[in-house]
Amino acid sequence: MANPPLISVVDDDNSVRESVQSLMRSVGFAVTVFASAEEFLNWDHLRDTDCLILDVRMPGMSGIELQRHLMASHYEIPIIFITAHASEEEVRSLALRNGAVAYLAKPLSEEALLNAVQSALSRGRGNRQSKLE
């Protein structure tokens, strides 16, 4: 049996991490959670992540900065941004231009998040397939 997709959640809000983790596990995904971008970058299995759910604003490195770092390091991890500041059109545009799969406002709609994760996983499989060819 194949391993379930691995979803990594990076958010400084513990309640968000716990609720997203619970939702993802309830539909059969493996989940890892991190309180900061730095914690995620120091994780030994970063490359195993199939989808990254990432808060935009966090103390230390922001979600946008983490996205830039991953791009510069040639990590092709599909990213879903989540934020309590959805009205920041400039940040939203930058995130999507840089390849984010979705940009969702908190409080999160479970349906919207699950749809975004499915889209991210489809995109990720396409990226992996093209590398193999």
Locations of the language-model features?
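Alpha4 helix (beta4-alpha4-beta5 surface) of REC/receiver domains from two-component response regulators
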Residues: 65, 86-102
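Active-site beta3 strand of CheY-like receiver
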Residues: 47-53
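The C-terminal output helix
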Residues: 118-133
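Hydrophobic/aromatic residues positioned on beta-strands within the core alpha/beta folds
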Residues: 82-83
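C-terminal output helix
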Residues: 108-118
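Two-component/phosphorelay signaling modules centered on CheY-like receiver
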Residues: 14-32, 98
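Receiver (REC) domain active-site loop signature in two-component systems and cognate sites
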Residues: 58
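Acidic catalytic/metal-coordinating carboxylates
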Residues: 35-36, 62-66
